[in-house]
């Protein structure tokens, strides 16, 4: 999101900007790197901090907080060797900055032509984020979360039922152990997990299902769905403090969730002259 925010701001002020922005985030630190050719000036620190705040990293206990994290920039000018292959006298003859393989994929499983399992996983996380921002229920939620949906298909490639739903969501340490013993800690962790699992099934999923208006998709939900909620048992440490993040490291969830094919090039932080992005969109 930070890489795309930098790109958006540069294109807003200079539509001819050539941008390849990468972002690395880890405990208390953001590093921006890449190559840019533009006539615009943008405040990289402000852009990064606004995105981090919008996502929800606003507390020091997360070990990654919008106001206090360091933001370093190692962005430099685009290579003239690359630029000479991109910019031409006739804009209609614009070249590509690189070669590669790009793929498109579409399915009639959903109204947006995306694979059903990916669409449902995205819906789950979008509703989970809405619940967290509303702050009325599941008030222990923290910003980091992941989801995966496994669907059973028949021999004709038609979805017949949802088999498994995985929801991993970061949370506060909202139940404290009675003492310092390992037994007490395990008991507190089990109580937290039970509460989160109950809320996922009784609060989150009904809201997700309520937003689905396709009768064929609704028919896939059943009482036999296996729910894996925070399978490790605890998810207090998360975000960039728990897992270092890097632009382009999750290319499958950014595309078709394992369906179709992928040429390996990420999308975020790249202007349309980068065919990794524009050609994949065109396909």
Show the residue positions of the predicted features.
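Short, hydrophobic/amphipathic alpha-helical packing segments
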Residues: 3-7, 121-125, 201, 279-283
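Short, charge-patterned binding micro-sites
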Residues: 19-39
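N-terminal, positively charged regions that mediate nucleic acid binding
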Residues: 1-20
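Active-site-surrounding "flap" and adjacent substrate/cofactor-binding loops of secreted or lumenal enzymes
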Residues: 38-52
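Alpha-helix N-cap/helix-initiation motif
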Residues: 41, 113, 117, 189, ...
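C-terminal catalytic subdomain
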Residues: 249-251, 256-283
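Short glycine/threonine-rich loop-to-helix capping motif typified by GTGT followed
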Residues: 35-42, 232-248
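Glycine-rich, mobile lid/loop segments that gate access to catalytic sites or pores
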Residues: 28, 46, 53-237
């Amino acid at each position: 999101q930070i890489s795309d925010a930098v790109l958006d701001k540069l294109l807003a002020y200079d539509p001819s900007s050539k941008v390849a922005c990468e972002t690395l985030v880890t405990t208390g630190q953001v590093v921006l790197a890449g190559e840019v050719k533009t006539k615009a000036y943008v405040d990289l620190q402000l852009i990064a901090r606004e995105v981090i705040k919008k996502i929800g990293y606003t507390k020091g206990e997360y070990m990654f907080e919008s106001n206090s994290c360091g933001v370093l920039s190692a962005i430099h000018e685009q290579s003239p060797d690359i630029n000479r292959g991109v910019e031409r006298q006739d804009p209609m003859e614009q070249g590509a900055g690189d070669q590669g393989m790009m793929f498109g994929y579409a399915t009639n499983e959903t109204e947006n032509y995306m694979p059903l399992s990916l669409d449902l996983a995205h819906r789950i996380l979008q509703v989970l984020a809405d619940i967290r921002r509303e702050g009325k229920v599941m008030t222990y939620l923290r910003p980091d979360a992941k989801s995966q949906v496994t669907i059973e298909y028949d021999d004709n490639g038609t979805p017949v039922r949802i088999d498994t739903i995985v929801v991993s969501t970061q949370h506060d340490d909202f139940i404290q152990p009675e003492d310092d013993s390992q037994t007490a800690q395990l008991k507190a962790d089990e109580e937290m997990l039970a509460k989160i699992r109950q809320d996922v099934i009784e609060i989150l999923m009904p809201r997700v299902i309520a937003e689905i208006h396709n009768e064929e998709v609704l028919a896939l939900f059943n009482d036999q769905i296996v729910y894996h909620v925070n399978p490790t048992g605890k998810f207090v440490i998360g975000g960039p403090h728990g897992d270092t993040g890097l632009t382009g490291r999750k290319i499958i969830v950014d595309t078709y969730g394992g369906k179709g094919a992928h040429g390996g090039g990420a999308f975020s932080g790249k202007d349309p002259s980068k065919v990794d992005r524009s050609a994949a969109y065109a396909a």
